[in-house]
Structure formats: structure tokens, C-alpha cells
């Protein structure tokens, strides 16, 4: 793995990690928004998945301008999941945030979210309301993830909030306490891994929301949720090692839920309540139907995308990026 610039002697308080592959169109904006933060004791770790466009050139140029940027390049494209985990493995800060290469954070995002986490040792995650933008940066609308509802004492209530409602997992890109992520699932190599990590974090601590749009998430045609409709393509996007491997993402997600509830440090009564939450999970948000689609996808790889389009046409989109996209 190639690396550019790792000269800082003192560990920063915050790490922002950008995993990227062929991100030349939007990457510079993401870099600039990070380096322009009002809280300056941060590092920006970029892991490049062997990009073939100008990504490496852009990263090297900014690394020469600002010593807070640490650039790593993988010899081959490992897939998104390993690349997300690589930036975390290089993180030295007490607080950590993943930033998609096509998204932006406002100048006070780091200062405000870390201030909350410093004042709230019981919290593992802080994020803000999300402002959606289009490919040109135009406003599409706001998305309130209602993360404040996970700011409760009961782990089972937090788990229910993260698993039983329909949401687009944007809080995966919130500011985490790094110690809470240590030993966690991080980004698993399966569709729904972001949902699994948020559920695991809900068992480890409370989650706090800042009721102001401090992060901008971009909607465009090349976004993963739009570009990868077939099950095999989704699996390969997550991890190139699983190309052509049978994938049952809904079943995998449920198994991960079961494992995290069994391994979490919970009182017996609370563990029972968490298990009851997972029993309800099958009956909500089309999860049972998705499990059937996983099996059908063995012989009809395009069926997940077809099924999702039919559901959206008949019943509407889930809250989040699909709702914002329809406003264009």
C-alpha cells in the first residue's frame, strides 16, 4: 500500500475518513469541506481503491498543501467495505467519521458534534439533520433522521429505533466515539452492513442529534443505491472477493442482529426485550418479502431491483434519499 505524508507527531482529536474509487468529480469539494473545519485538530485519511481517474493526483496535491491529509492507495480495488475499514484502521483520533467522497460537511460540523460527545460520555454517536443536494450542489430538501429518539437509556428501545423503522442509514456517516467502534462490525461485506453497524452502536450507547443541517449528502445517478440493482453487483461493490458468490443479504443482516444481541453486555431482562424486537423485525418494512427475494435472486439476479421499483411505485419510497430525489 502506497502512502503519502504521515509526519504528524501528535495524534489529532478527530479523524475524518474518505474511502474513494474514481471520485475525481466531487472529491475536491469533500476535501476542502473537511480541511475548512473550525475545529482544526483533525486529520483527513483518504484510502484510494486503485482509482483510474485523477483521484490520486488530487489527493497528492492536497497532501502537499496540508499535512493533516494522509493519503493511502490500495494496489487493487478491494471493494467498498474493505476500503471503509482501511480508513478506520489508520485513524488516530478519539472521534471518527466516515465521509463519502461526494458529500460535504459545513465548517462547524466537527466542532459541534465532538463538543456533544465530549460532554456526553454515555453517547457513542452524534449527527445532524441532513441537507440533500444534487450533482451541481443545488438544494433538494432536508431529511430529519429523528436520531434524537435514540437518545434514551434503554438499549432495547434504541435497538427498536434502529431496526424496526424505515430509514436510509445516513447516520452511518455521523461522528462516532472511536472507542465504541473498536471491536465492532465496522463496514461488513454485505448489503445492509451500514444498518447492522448502527444497530450494534445502539446497544453500546446513546445517540444524539443536532437539530440543524450540518452535513450535505449528494444525490446523483452514480450513487451506489442507484447504480447497483442486481444482488451480484451489490455484493461485488461491497467486496470484490465475493464476486459471483451466493448472497443472502437480508438473512445475513438478521443473523448479525442475533449475534450482536447475544454478545452485548446487557441485563437478562433487557436481552429478552432485544430478542423480542428482532422477532418483530420480520413483520415490518418488507423484511420477510426481502428474504424471499434473496432466494429468488439465485436464479434471477435482477429481481432485487425489480422488486424495489415495484414496491416504490405501489407504496411509495422509504424516507431518505429516495424521497429527496423525487423532488428534482
Regions found by a protein language model. Name each.
Residues 48-57, 76, 100:
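A conserved acidic beta->alpha catalytic loop
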Residues 89, 106, 151-231:
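Conserved nucleotide-sugar donor-binding catalytic segment
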Amino acid at each position: 500500500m502506497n502512502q503519502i505524508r504521515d509526519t504528524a507527531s501528535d495524534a489529532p482529536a478527530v479523524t475524518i475518513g474518505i474511502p474513494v474509487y474514481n471520485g475525481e468529480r466531487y472529491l475536491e469539494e469533500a476535501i476542502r469541506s473537511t480541511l475548512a473545519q473550525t475545529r482544526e485538530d483533525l486529520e483527513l485519511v483518504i484510502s484510494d481503491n486503485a482509482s483510474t481517474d485523477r483521484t490520486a493526483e488530487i489527493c497528492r496535491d492536497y497532501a502537499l498543501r496540508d499535512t493533516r491529509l494522509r493519503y493511502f492507495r490500495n494496489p487493487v480495488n478491494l471493494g467498498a467495505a474493505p476500503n471503509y475499514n482501511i480508513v478506520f484502521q489508520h485513524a488516530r483520533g478519539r472521534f471518527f467519521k466516515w465521509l463519502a467522497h461526494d458529500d460535504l460537511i459545513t465548517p462547524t460540523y466537527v466542532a459541534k458534534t465532538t463538543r456533544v460527545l465530549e460532554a456526553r460520555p454515555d453517547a457513542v454517536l452524534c449527527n445532524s439533520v441532513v441537507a440533500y443536494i444534487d450533482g451541481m450542489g443545488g438544494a433538494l430538501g432536508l431529511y430529519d433522521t429523528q436520531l434524537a429518539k435514540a437518545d434514551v437509556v434503554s438499549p432495547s428501545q434504541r435497538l427498536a429505533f434502529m431496526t424496526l423503522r424505515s430509514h436510509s442509514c445516513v447516520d452511518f456517516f455521523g461522528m462516532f466515539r472511536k472507542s465504541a467502534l473498536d471491536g465492532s462490525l465496522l463496514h461488513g461485506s454485505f448489503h445492509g452492513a451500514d444498518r447492522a453497524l448502527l444497530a450494534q452502536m445502539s446497544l453500546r450507547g446513546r445517540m444524539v442529534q443536532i437539530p440543524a443541517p450540518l452535513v450535505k449528502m449528494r444525490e446523483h445517478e452514480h450513487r451506489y443505491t442507484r447504480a447497483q440493482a442486481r444482488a451480484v453487483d451489490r455484493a461485488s461493490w461491497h467486496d470484490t472477493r465475493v464476486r459471483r458468490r451466493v448472497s443472502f443479504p437480508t438473512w445475513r443482516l438478521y443473523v448479525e442482529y442475533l449475534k450482536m444481541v447475544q454478545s452485548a453486555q446487557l441485563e437478562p431482562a433487557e436481552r429478552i426485550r432485544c430478542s423480542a424486537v428482532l422477532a418483530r423485525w420480520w413483520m415490518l418494512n418488507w423484511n420477510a418479502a426481502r428474504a424471499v427475494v434473496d432466494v429468488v435472486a439465485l436464479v434471477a439476479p435482477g429481481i432485487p431491483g425489480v422488486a424495489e421499483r415495484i414496491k416504490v411505485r405501489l407504496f411509495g419510497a422509504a424516507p431518505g434519499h429516495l424521497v429527496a430525489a423525487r423532488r428534482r
